[in-house]
């Protein structure tokens, strides 16, 4: 099994939970904190150099995504978040249960409210605040609707957690909610009881 601990930047090394999967080719540098059951996929880059990056639990950062910071602008990614292929999140806050679509860009100082979807290719401008449960499309990004789609995003995040855990045999009795391909089915402990 591939084991990755991250690279130091000015003496600061990443803090990566033992229950995290990091694919070969991914780069995690500096002040980066990654929560339990999250996954970082091929060639994704997280660079915590002039501020910190925090990634919550059960979150997946997909292939070629880039997370970076700016002075006084950390990059904070919540729990149960999917950051799609080639997406960029720069010095911004993404709250829990969000989906950042493929090749979307979230610029410095932006805040993405809980349960929101940023569509593929969308551009969230500097300091733009997206309300919770919003769908954002276009360049520049505009809220086109709000909806209660948190459950769908949550299921997507759980699907990634479950798939990497099973494929790599890392957590045969993985804790937390499970996704059976259609719905959230509770915890593995619930199933055992």
Task: Identify the meaning behind each predicted range.
Residues 1-11, 15, 49, 55-57, ...:
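Glycine-rich hexapeptide-repeat left-handed beta-helix
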